[in-house]
Amino acid sequence: MYELHIKPGQLTLSQLRKISRHALKVSLESSCIEAIHASTQVVNQVIAENRVAYGINTGFGLLANTRIAPEDLETLQRSIVLSHAAGIGELMNDETVRMMMVLKINSLARGFSGIRLSVIEALMTLVNAQIYPCVPKKGSVGASGDLAPLAHMSTVLLGEGEARYQGNIISGAKALEIAGMQPITLAPKEGLALLNGTQASCAFGLEGLFAAEDLFASATLCGAMTVDAALGSRRPFDDRVHQVRGHQSQIDSALIYRHILDTHSEVSHSHTACEKVQDPYSLRCQPQVMGACLQQIRNSAAIYEIEANSVSDNPLVFAEDGDIISAGNFHAEPIAMASDNLALAIAEIGSLSERRMALLIDNSLSKLPPFLVNNGGVNSGFMIAQVTAAALASENKSLAHPACVDSLPTSANQEDHVSMATFAGRRLKEMAENTRGILAVELLAAAQGLDFRSPLKSSELIETAKAELRERVDFYDKDRYFAPDIKQANQLLIEAMHNKLIPEGLLPSL
């Protein structure tokens, strides 16, 4: 259980990673309460003075010019939640929903949304009770915010919809009963405040970010293992090479390879006088490719961290000036572009891994037994495992197509440009799973290759990592049912055991 004390607008990437991985006990910094109350007072004043303000006493979208009678204001807020809960498809997992809820709490608590403290506290109560609304994955275009996902999240506050508790789907009414809550009657502006925002897109993006960091760590280890398994040179990782180019992420990537490979090993000493002049690109250019991927991970992380702490509601309430401004912070273009760029990194990490693995099974390049098995012909070894890796790499190439360039107008052309940030973030998990599968195959292949170099040893870190794998998967001495080996290697990667190999501060959330 992770105890999270929210100081609105100050969540860190390290905290966000923990939110994605652990059940929570959430509390709120008391200093934010005054700003929350002040924003609701501005909304109340607008109603008392009978002034027109979007979403408070008007319709929504193209119906913004429709004035709502005072007696219908509460009905308006309830109606927007119920009508906008129109998502479709598989449900988000609990971790994504929890992240979305915490991001919404963090945003609302900054005091620019005109929503009562009691509503924010109701969301916190659900999080603390580990009750997560059932939210379909599909149905948002990332402007005006993530309306459908956040509406599904909000239905439970009304005693409607469904929630998941201890792995079981229950009614919204039952969820409130378990949490010791009563259904909420939303005040003016509150339904819109709950629905408007980029929290679903950001939650998907953060989920992809943390997966990408884990993949980067594992891929660097696999790449280093493959260098020694293929009798590759350490010279391309020399710091001087990368300093003269100047890209910090490339410099850092080379540093990580040097850290894992160490200065030398018995394997590297064994071929210092070989006739090879230089290695194929998949070995030699790893810092350049992985450095570029690291840069995209860092860029995306910076954007996600800002967005996680942002106010993406509309309209915004500026209590100090008594102003309510209708604008467009709900437009998730920054997240869409961040997720698109992160998708490129995830795809390239997998693509490079597949090429390294293909090099290992090619006897003409690696000088290892063909397909990494003795008695080839009788045994096929890693032949089809490489085909699996190629299939996954190819899938990721299609999934990496930018989402943000594909806008479709909605709401009768009132919302005529949208971000598609939700899909941009959502596909990252599938891409990460594909890349993890590729890395699992390379991890097996690199360990197999190193075993063929026995009794020569690689670096201490690589030998330790290989031993961890060998606790789960034996040397492939002859053909056997291969899928369980890949599954075991994949599980090792899921456990993110290789993050410990990355020096502190080089990955954004670690």
Swiss-Prot record:
Signal peptide segment: none
Pfam families in the cross-refs: Lyase_aromatic
GO process annotations (BP): L-histidine catabolic process to glutamate and formamide; L-histidine catabolic process to glutamate and formate
InterPro entries membership: Aromatic_Lyase, Fumarase/histidase_N, HutH, L-Aspartase-like, Phe/His_NH3-lyase_AS
A GO CC term assigned to this protein in UniProt: cytoplasm
GO molecular function: histidine ammonia-lyase activity
Location of 2,3-didehydroalanine (Ser) modifications: S144
Residues forming coiled coils: none
Covalent link location (5-imidazolinone (Ala-Gly)): A143-G145
Protein keywords: Cytoplasm, Histidine metabolism, Lyase
Pathway it works in: Amino-acid degradation; L-histidine degradation into L-glutamate; N-formimidoyl-L-glutamate from L-histidine: step 1/3
Annotated catalysed reactions: L-histidine = trans-urocanate + NH4(+)
Subcellular location: Cytoplasm
EC assignment: 4.3.1.3
UniProt PTM comment: Contains an active site 4-methylidene-imidazol-5-one (MIO), which is formed autocatalytically by cyclization and dehydration of residues Ala-Ser-Gly.
SUPFAM superfamilies: L-aspartase-like (SSF48557)
Family per similarity comment: Belongs to the PAL/histidase family.
The name this protein goes by in its record: Histidine ammonia-lyase
Gene that specifies this protein: hutH
